[in-house]
A protein has these predicted regions:
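Amphipathic, Lys/Arg-enriched alpha-helical "gate/interface" segment within cytosolic domains
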Residues: 1-115
Length: 115
């Protein structure tokens, strides 16, 4: 399950239980809609309640990120698991966004907003 919050200069997505390709497509649609209103997007991905993800999510993420290499300013990854932090770092190969990994939501959101 995914919950997406669209705020002025930040799109926040919280993933609960298993992250499915249906959830990911919902996130893609929200990103594309937000990009119609602004040139670059700040994104906060909260993986703290995510139990795992399906393989098709990983593939969809690679395709989507490669098709939007310059559309993100900052991507904050909120997680308590080191391997999810590494996945965020790996995404830097496909985007020129600044990517930060955080364990605390306050600093994650402040950084994602550019503060």
């Amino acid at each position: 399950m995914i919950v997406i919050q669209d705020e002025k200069n930040l799109l926040k997505a919280s993933i609960y239980a298993e992250f499915t390709v249906s959830d990911y497509r919902e996130l893609e649609n929200a990103i594309v809609a937000k990009l119609k209103a602004q040139r670059k997007l700040n994104l906060l991905l909260d993986f703290t309640s995510m139990a795992g993800f399906t393989l098709d999510v990983a593939w969809e993420d690679i395709k989507f990120t490669r098709s939007h290499p310059h559309d993100f300013a900052r991507i904050a990854v909120l997680t308590s698991d080191q391997w999810r932090s590494w996945l965020g770092w790996l995404a830097t190969a496909f985007t020129d966004a600044q990517i930060g990994s955080f364990t605390d939501p306050g600093p994650a959101e402040a950084w994602a907003r550019g503060a």
